[in-house]
Amino acid sequence: MTGVQQAYRGRIRLEVAGRDYLSPSNVFERSRDMAYACKAIDSPVGELKLVASDTGLAAILWQDDDPGRVRLGPLFEDPDNAVLVETERQLCAYFAGELTRFDLPLDFQGTEFQKSVWAALLTIPFGETRSYGEIARQIGHPTAFRAVGAANGRNPISIVAPCHRVVGSTGALTGFAGGLATKERLLGLERAHSTL
């Protein structure tokens, strides 16, 4: 096999016949090969499934989540997993209005573009919102607001990486994996406690 190796944002990309081997399918194939610890918890917005890899929190899934939204490997119950226990503690404090910023190890699995969007979500302050266009400009792709919306919709770590804080250009609430009523509830909770 012949190919050209190039530096690619700190990683090696192997190009063979024009194919980028860091394509989404290859990224997700790697994540499907791993087993993930999980724990279900009750919350004010319904049951949440917390999922951790061996390096950090990998997902927070909604009770009625679309199974194809977040691609993960096999899950096994581990209610004593340290990352999951700490995530539950911080989520409880968040819902009680006692926590405005999470401090957890995160393990985002996605494309480089998706990870740049998800990293931008982490910069949105508690109680504030940003538009898809603002996020697109922040990550250096000012015309990619639709792609930002798609990446936002695939955010695997809801609430902690606050995709609920992203709204339409007019300020209207737009799609959310947990449902628009949940998005409105999370934003309302944050507005009520934004002076913390």
Identify the residue ranges that each predicted region occupies.
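Basic nucleic-acid-binding alpha-helical/helix-turn surface characteristic of O6-alkylguanine DNA
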Residues: 21-142, 189-196
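Regulatory, non-catalytic segments
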Residues: 146-155
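N-terminal amphipathic/basic-hydrophobic helices that include classical n-h-c signal peptides
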Residues: 1-33, 174
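Major-groove DNA-recognition helix of helix-turn-helix-type DNA-binding domains
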Residues: 156, 160
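…primarily DNA-binding HTH/wHTH and HhH modules…
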Residues: 169-196
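Short cysteine clusters
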Residues: 163
